[in-house]
Amino acid sequence: MRIAVEGCCHGELDKIYAALAHLERVEHVKVDLLICCGDFQAVRNVDDLECMSVPDKYKELGTFHRYYSGEVRAPVPTLFIGGNHEASNYLWELYYGGFVAPDVYYLGHSGVVKFGDLRIGGLSGIFKGNDYRKGHYERPPYTHGGEVKSAYHVRQFDVEKLKSVAEPLDVFLSHDWPRGISRYGDQAELIRKKRFLADELRDNSLGSPPAEELLHALKPRYWFSAHLHVKFAAMVRHGDERCTRFLALDKCLPRRDFMQVIDLPDKSAAGGFTLDREWLSVLRANHARHSVTRKPASAPNSAPSSIAEHRTWVERNVSDEALKPPEFVKTIEPHDAANERRRPGQGTAPRGVERNPQTVRLMEMLALDFKLDLDPGGGGGVRGGNGGGGANNFQNNFRAPPPPQHQGQGGDWTGEGGGIQRYPIPREGPFTLVPRQARGAPPPPPPPRKADDNEINLDDL
């Protein structure tokens, strides 16, 4: 199997698929699966834009609506997670995952799915301690108390479900980086590229603490991220001789490192997307604990005996044929360029939650009740940081093992990279580590900060 991994999509599906077509035409490299690491922007019409956390002047329809409407079809199966710039109303319909368009699959707020025999897990959104322990209380039109932002903040409930996964993962996806990952790669080079990150890198505050926990708990073969608009590679060697190859990529712009092709000769794409039996068992074991109010979710049920009990139910009641995900169904009308007179920023946010037939079918298959459109009011418990949801109350006691001394500068496993002038796509794999190097002296302090139009204000994310 050969996969292409892309960083931030930002609604540029046409350009990303054009890059893949160029790669196939010029270098005769054909991929079986495209993976996008967030900020996908599955925007179907101008109303969806009102549910995306972007200033009006930056709201653009992008090209996804053409794939949603059926005007064009994805030329390669595509899998993505959510980031911090998404049409949150649409992704909430598919909280457990599903097709947002034909052959374009959303992994869910958290999830595990198979493509052929490649097992892929992922976590959508970004980490903010203020919202981490809250339930999923946000609903369209996201007009109360910053809901349009908090809707994409990672929740502890989703993280703990992923910690229950015991079977090996080949690939894991997150939008923001696991905290501390820079220690396993060339941190000095990262600071050279993104000087405004220097302080967070030095005090180890850059990145997601929950993602760091998942990295060391799940130990996937590969971990792909985006968010910071820079290419960065690292190698994490775990104590049990397993290792994780980490790669973050840029956004889709000319002459930027936004895509990497990776060869997986031991994997097959045969069968396409299928649901994962262990993950279905985890969903059943934890469904009753899922809070759709402000109240924090109950502690997830991660006991192996409980997961095993639900696994037995899944084995008995879910056939192999039923593991094929439900087919894509349109739930609203797509953008109509010929008749739509409203511009981006002039839409009307939808009120309420659409019951997506894919989600309904999944709940019926698992014999679970539908919770996504329940009234979030009256949950109590977590307001303004009280009840365990505030930043000051967030405690992360996890301490990752220190990286071996040789890893500080020797984590780039992706090779020279190569590039295509308009679409800088590194050449196909497999890729090997660069020679190990001893840890050098710490990088010098950065020069005084200057205004930079490209700088990312992490506090606004």
Where does each model-flagged region fall?
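Extended recognition/assembly regions associated with phosphoester-bond processing machinery
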Residues: M1-L461
